[in-house]
Amino acid sequence: MHELSYATSVLNAILEAVEQQEALGRKVIKVNDINLEIGELTLLSVDQLQFVFEVISEDTVCKGAELKAEMVKPKIFCMDCEFEGDLDTKDELEVICPKCESRNVKLKGGKEFNIVNATIEFDDEE
């Protein structure tokens, strides 16, 4: 279950951002949601990622934060007909050009895992 390592990375990055805000004198109450970009070729389960994140963030300001994921399709470039477009990831084992059926293709992207942003609630009284 590689979702644990991804969830741990997200939690560590967000907690580091929280520390930076608190070092600037801003009191963080909680993190409400975290928006991610996830490439389809990572084969991550968003449901499992959310579950693991809930478990490991239990005693932090991220407790209860919702992970929201936008799935990113990999792009394909055909070296024969120069087709460029989204790759259908139904069958990851067979990568062929949808236009000319050539196997002489290059993949671009699809393995992304990025934190886009997070919604953080601050104590406005300070």
Swiss-Prot record:
GO molecular function: nickel cation binding; zinc ion binding
Pfam families xref list: HypA (PF01155)
Keywords associated with the record: Metal-binding, Nickel, Zinc
Gene Ontology BP terms: protein maturation; protein modification process
Binding residues for Ni(2+): H2
Keyword Membrane appears in the UniProt entry: no
Disulfides per UniProt: none
Binding of Zn(2+), residues: C78, C81, C97, C100
Zinc among keywords: yes
Function statement: Involved in the maturation of [NiFe] hydrogenases. Required for nickel insertion into the metal center of the hydrogenase.
Homology family: Belongs to the HypA/HybF family.
Protein name: Hydrogenase maturation factor HypA
